A protein has these predicted regions:
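A charged, amphipathic alpha-helical module
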Residues: 1-54
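Short acidic, glycine/serine/threonine-rich loops at helix termini
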Residues: 51-56, 107-111
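C-terminal catalytic subdomain
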Residues: 65-205
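Acidic catalytic cores of enzymes that act on phosphate-bearing nucleotides/polynucleotides
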Residues: 53-68
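Conserved small/polar residues in nucleotide/adenosyl-binding loops
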Residues: 229-234
């Protein structure tokens, strides 16, 4: 962990707890996987985890995902399955993100307008607390969960891996169940733009052509809660 974090190791005091948690999960996996070749985890991360263990599991989740063991947050079973599919197809680390907010107008004008062929409605911020694998971040820093720290002592919210997501082509994919018990999935192609987010968590400035329409008529209308980012794997995903 120290080698991976390098200068981003801003919370060295929490590393022993995180390391022990990771080893415990790996031991549990080996004890329970049986004949299964592959493993994926839908893990508990809040609100009870940090008060019981004294840290958040985000960094460990990111490391396991980087090992080929996808871990979803908030016991998100369909997110876990989506990550597993993305891992198998791309043969690369994936991450779960929320479609968090639109790109601020001043950021769009300063860093995107005239430089990329996207309208502001084509762009958005993809965010999660800090569960993205380090090799998918431009740089990474160990920090604390700012959202949780609004209601809890900061020292029990340490353990997020934060940084801007590496720019490049991406595929969005999500599998989800509907209220009438049907499986549905969406997929879209786009890119992460080389734009500084000036924010926290694992986060990036994303762009998909016609994202405004896609958001309204697919994500909202069909009740998809969040997204999955992988490497550029759309052709293989269509085969799946």
């Amino acid at each position: 962990m120290e080698a991976e974090l390098g200068e981003g190791n801003k919370k060295p005091e929490v590393l022993p707890k995180l390391a022990q948690y990771e080893l415990t999960l790996l031991d549990w996996i080996e004890a329970h996987r049986g004949y299964r070749k592959y493993v994926a985890i839908a893990g508990k991360c809040w609100p009870a985890f940090q008060t019981q263990f004294g840290f958040v599991p985000c960094y460990v989740n990111s490391r396991l995902t980087g090992m080929g063991i996808p871990v979803s947050c908030e016991v998100d079973i369909y997110g876990c399955l989506s990550e597993f599919i993305g891992t198998c197809v791309s043969e690369d680390a994936v991450t779960l993100l929320d479609i968090n907010n639109s790109v601020p107008a001043d950021m769009y004008k300063e860093s995107i307008e005239g430089k990329f062929d996207y309208t502001q409605k084509d762009t958005f911020m993809g965010f999660h607390c800090g569960n993205t694998c380090s090799k998918k971040l431009s740089s990474c820093t160990m920090k604390y969960q700012k959202i949780m720290a609004r209601n809890l002592p900061e020292e029990v919210t340490q353990g997020t891996l934060e940084g801007d997501i590496v720019p490049g082509d991406i595929t969005f994919y999500r599998l989800q169940s509907t209220a009438d018990c049907k499986l549905r999935a969406y997929m879209a192609e786009g890119e992460v733009l080389p734009v500084a987010t000036k924010s926290f968590g694992g986060i990036g400035v994303f762009a998909i052509p016609e994202m405004g329409r896609f958001y309204r008529h697919v994500l909202i209308e069909k009740n998809y809660p969040c997204l999955l980012y992988t490497s550029d794997a759309a052709d293989d995903m269509q085969c799946v």
